[in-house]
Amino acid sequence: MNRRGLTIAIGFALSLSALPAAADPADTVILETLDKISARVSRVEVPVGTTITFGSLKITPRHCDKRPPEETPESSVFIEIIEELPDAQPKLEFSGWMFASSPALSALDHPVYDVWVVDCKNASTSAIETTP
């Protein structure tokens, strides 16, 4: 290998060590919901792939990532929110990524309800951590 090739190989190897750590997938999403009519705020834990009902909304988190502790804190969730009203076809209100650190970046735009991501966690590790 010539000198230039060696320099490129070393530079590439060093750049890999500077990349941020990959986010860890989690199995549970922590959401907060707001009913704007009653001003009631609720915190809900939803397993990924499970649908919950909040008012007329059906909320289904599809994927949840949480950055490792050595990185800047961030939880990101791919979520689908469908509104089901009586005598109407279900309407997709939101489908996309929501970020715990920036709730306004990709928010649900609904006149009655707000939904935002608080965190992601693994239910199995949480049970172990809380055991005395």
Tell where the protein language model's regions lie, with residue ranges.
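Bacterial N-terminal signal peptides
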Residues: 9-17
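N- and C-terminal low-complexity/disordered segments
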Residues: 2-5, 19-132
